[in-house]
Amino acid sequence: RDTIGNWSTSGSFAITIDNFDKICSQIQAAANTCDLVLVNAGSSAGSEDFTAAAVEKLGRLLVHGIAVRPGHPVIIGFVPRNSAGVSSKEVPVIGVPGYPVSAALTSEIFVEPLLRIWQGEPEFLPVILKAKLTRKINSPAGDDDFLRVVVGEVNHQWLAAPLSRGAGVTTSLSKADGIVIIPRNIQGLEAGDTVN
């Protein structure tokens, strides 16, 4: 809720236990009354992660998993709004990973841009600067890796210091003032490499 606190919100639904039928019921109730449904957690591939199956049962599951890290198990789909048993407008559903850093990144990549478009606001264009990476970073091939960094100027040169990583490392959210995107075809960066 804090990540999108600046945006207009119309509803919040109770936490639902990991039960397929109850999750289906809550998603449908939200689709019936809201323009966008965000489901937090339950998007991975565990035995208690029912969001993808629920969206698929209720409507159309478009994506389950994207090539970004953190945030890989994102779900994107549509569920029809039902009014008096009649289906009408399809409502977008985004399944947000449960880990906080993954959830924040998912909001930055998918939720905020969608809300900006709907509200007629301009696209967010971040300040981009070139900086030298302060230490070596390993990155798995196949995913765009979003690395949170602290940026500072030392001796007239910008430096980017990588923060601790992991989908649950919340200090990276509060301390970061920059993000370095390591493309999926690169398996890491060396200390001293220039990054944006």
What are these regions (language model features)?
Residues R1-V39:
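Phosphate-binding glycine-rich loops and their immediate beta-loop-alpha structural context
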Residues T9-F13, A41, G120-V127:
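Flexible, glycine/charged-enriched surface loops at secondary-structure junctions
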Residues T16-I17, S44, V68, P80:
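Residue-level "edge-of-site" marker
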Residues I23-S25, D49-A52, F78, L105-T106:
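Short acidic, glycine/serine/threonine-rich loops at helix termini
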Residues N40-A41, R135:
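Short glycine-centered, acidic/aromatic-flanked micro-motifs in structured strand/loop junctions
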Residues G42-E48, G98:
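Short glycine-rich anion-binding loops that position phosphate/pyrophosphate groups of nucleotides
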Residues G46-G59:
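Short Gly/Thr/Asp-enriched flexible loops that form oxyanion-binding sites at enzyme active sites
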Residues E56-N196:
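Flexible glycine/proline-rich
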